[in-house]
Amino acid sequence: MPTTNGKADGTSTPARILDAALASFATRGYEATSLDALAAGLEVRKQTILYWFPSKEVLLDAVIDRSAAELSVALEGSLATAGPGWVRVEAVVRSVFRLAARQPELLGLVREMGRLGPPAATRFVAALEPLVGRASEFLEAEMDSGHMRRHEPRLLLLAIYSTVIGMLTEVELLRALGEEPTTRSLVRRRAEILDLLRSALVTVP
């Protein structure tokens, strides 16, 4: 029976498999990823992967669940220390940019979920639903108080998501073309998004 022992750094075998699968799904795509290739890259037998994750579909579900949990923790952490109103929106955008810089494969997975559609995308959205629900309630309260312009909260969240992910996707495209964005350019892009969102949302300076 395979053990959970992994690398000398203490990373368990299941965690290593999930890391490798995430990287491959994010860069190569789900269909182009094979368990044989993952096993070869990890220097384990294919049966070891299948012991922990009985099929490629189960592996994808596990990657989605872990990635959604990591995203939720990062966003919840930024919100826990943020103030009210616009400051909370700004905190989320900054958190997403930091996460994309540290773990670009998460951004790649989000794009891949959009391409795959249901049931993978549905599972990812469902995992984030508690966070989305709280965000919708926050936006509704800000609109009711007159601090933000009136929009349908969930449609507004979708627009914010599309704007931020679109900008980050452009950054990843530049990397793919061999042009590594500088810290200054990333800060400038983040500032541009924040200015755009603030002008579209905030009614009170």
State the predicted function of each range.
Residues M1-T3, R98, R102, V132-S145, ...:
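C-terminal peripheral helix-coil segments that are non-catalytic and often amphipathic
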Residues P2-N5, D61-A91, V132-F138:
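Amphipathic alpha-helical linker/stalk segments
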Residues Y30-E31, P119, M148:
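Conserved hydrophobic residue
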Residues R88, A100-T122, E170-L177:
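Amphipathic alpha-helical segments used for helix-helix packing
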Residues A62, E76-E105, P153-I160, V187-R190:
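Hydrophobic alpha-helical connector segments
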Residues T13-R16, A20, S24-V58, A62:
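Helix-turn-helix
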Residues V87, T122-A127, M143-Y161:
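All-alpha amphipathic helical-bundle segments outside canonical DNA-binding/catalytic cores
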